[in-house]
Amino acid sequence: KTVRRQRQMCIRDRSSGLIATLIWGLAQMRTSLSAIVSRHFGSDHLDKIKSLIPQTFLMTLILGSIIGALLIFYFDVVAIFLFGDIEEHTFNYAKDYFKIRAIGLPISLLIALFFGVFRGFQNTSWAMYISLIGGVINIFLDVILIHGFGDSIKPMGVEGAAWASLTAQLVML
């Protein structure tokens, strides 16, 4: 049982690493948008960028959805590239976790973009509070969904960790 749990954690960590790399790589739009919003906010010329924020949100949503869908569809190829030859049950844990987390890719990118807009408007408090709320929800749901809760919620293991993260992201959005 301990070995199985360690394998699940290893796969979760590797899959999380790939998802995090994609999110932070693609979230550089946030940095650009933050700088542009900040410059125009400081010079009181927000009218010049009123269409930029919705356009960036739409582009992020489309790009994140396409990449998320491709990752779900081509998971087997990505997994073999990243993990090499792995045991079937370990592969299945990774697949379950990764596919759920890939659904959240566009959500993660939108959250990062919102944080960039907040920073551009010199309002870092909102991003901090939203992050704290998301983190607390994720931790709470991790415990419940991974280990279960009485007879009402059965333990979900690594899949529960993925659902906890996705749920926290939805609340943050």
Segments (PLM) and residue ranges:
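Single conserved hydrophobic/aromatic residue that forms the stacking wall/gate
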Residues: 1-7, 11
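Short alpha-helical transmembrane segments in multi-pass integral membrane proteins
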Residues: 37-104, 151-173
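Hydrophobic alpha-helical interface/terminus motif in multipass membrane transporters
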Residues: 5, 37, 78-79, 118, ...
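Transmembrane alpha-helical segments of multi-pass small-molecule transport proteins
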Residues: 100, 104-109, 131-139
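Hydrophobic/small/kink-forming positions within alpha-helical transmembrane segments
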Residues: 28, 135-136, 170
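Alpha-helical transmembrane segments of multi-pass membrane transporters/permeases
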Residues: 47, 117-144, 159-166
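Small-residue-rich hydrophobic transmembrane alpha-helices
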Residues: 12-69, 108-127
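Hydrophobic/aromatic residues in alpha-helical transmembrane segments
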Residues: 33, 74-75, 114, 141-142
